[in-house]
Amino acid sequence: MFRALARASATLGPQVAGWARTMATCQLLVAPPEALLRPLSIPNRLLLGPGPSNLAPRVLVAGGKQMIGHMHKEMFQIMDDIKQGIQYVFQTKNPLTLAISGSGHCALEAALFNILEPGDPFLVGVNGIWGQRAADIGERIGARVHPMIKDPGNHYTLQELEEALAQHKPVLLFLTQGESSSGVLQPLDGYGELCHRYNCLLLVDSVASLCGTPIYMDQQGIDVLYSGSQKVLNSPPGTSLISFSDKAKNKIYTRKTKPVSFYLDMKWLANIWGCDGKPRIYHHTTPVVSLYSLRESLALIAEQGLENSWRQHREVTAYLHGRLQGLGLQLFVKDPALRLPTVTTVAVPAGYDWRDIVNYVMDHFDIEITGGLGPSMGKVLRIGLLGCNATRENVDRVIQALQEALQRCSRNKL
């Protein structure tokens, strides 16, 4: 043993000497940041924008639990619980159902990276920022993107889509159920059936709408559905939900090329999430604590019941609409049937700078509301009633804040 140690020392001698010289000649040039030597301080704020939302107390507790390993059997059970929860809120029996280690953008990329190949025709409903993003990602992976552009606040009819499907013959159609940048709710009944008549898959973004308004993945013929954790689910940002129909799964498994992303390769993700019936093998380190939180947020919805959650958002948002109109404000989406029950858009009142209103509400009331986003920038104010934040008490608080802001903020009378 001693001879072996001596031989190892002789072999490593020059290398060890080099390390010693490096340590002797190099010095720390960056001091510990003073900011990190102070305690973390977070304001207590009511988040009534389009998301993220405040965390439900049970979700907050889950985020403080101790780590376990991402490949432990207990973690796999938590992942199985999450999968069943996603199947419930999506109303699907799809085996290929899982959570993505990343926000809603990650789920959108996972959908497009796995379904589309270079040269595939891709039809995109662009009536807000999320359609813009989908078209952008499609172009980046070499799809032939055909955008159907509409002004913010408008939706797509079956007739319009049928004409576009017949013209472009896409393999995939993208629609946003809840366009949070404009506050419009896209109808979905009959759209999956229409797509399938033209041999096209239907991809739907439900990030801002899930659990706030009905969606039935299987019954509505949706082939790929994704959502986020930080809206009605009241969970931290950083995880997202996704599911693929058998038709979509077949498209994935018969690709001619590999998906452009290894991290979002659905064949790998299907395995780590127990969707392929094979022993799970390491792909990436899943965000263990975030998955605790997601599991608990789905449990809360399961306990409340989807229909009760839908009713809560519909009734509280109707109350908000009445209070806003009582202030003389105009709702941006004119047709009540097309108003998103989770994110309400208000036309910026004449003469006001929307930034003044948003800043006043934040500075004086610690309430977040936001302006528009993408095509709706400068046109609207956005108020979100998401999950546990969807209460009449919160409506009264934000109305009081808006009323004072309209009285105190400067107004251009020209």
UniProtKB/Swiss-Prot annotation:
InterPro entries assigned to the protein according to its UniProt record, in alphabetical order: Aminotrans_V_dom (IPR000192), Aminotrans_V_PyrdxlP_BS (IPR020578), PyrdxlP-dep_Trfase (IPR015424), PyrdxlP-dep_Trfase_major (IPR015421), PyrdxlP-dep_Trfase_small (IPR015422), SP_NH2Trfase/AEP_transaminase (IPR024169)
EC number annotated for this UniProt entry: 2.6.1.44, 2.6.1.51
Keyword hit for Mitochondrion: yes
Motif annotated as Microbody targeting signal, chain positions: 412-414
Record key words, sorted: Acetylation, Aminotransferase, Mitochondrion, Peroxisome, Pyridoxal phosphate, Transferase, Transit peptide
Enzyme class: transferase
Modified residues (N6-acetyllysine): 247, 256, 334
GO biological process: glycine biosynthetic process, by transamination of glyoxylate; glyoxylate metabolic process
Transit peptide: 1-23
Post-translational modification N6-(pyridoxal phosphate)lysine, affected residues: 231
GO terms assigned for molecular function: alanine-glyoxylate transaminase activity; L-serine-pyruvate transaminase activity; protein homodimerization activity
Record-listed N6-succinyllysine modification sites: 247
Cofactor(s) needed: pyridoxal 5'-phosphate
Coiled-coil segments on the chain, per record: none
Record's keyword annotation contains S-adenosyl-L-methionine: no
PROSITE patterns named in the record: AA_TRANSFER_CLASS_5
Record-listed substrate binding positions: 382
GO cellular component term of the entry, any: peroxisome
Assembly behavior: Homodimer.
Family to which the UniProt record says this protein belongs: Belongs to the class-V pyridoxal-phosphate-dependent aminotransferase family.
Annotated protein name in UniProt: Alanine--glyoxylate aminotransferase
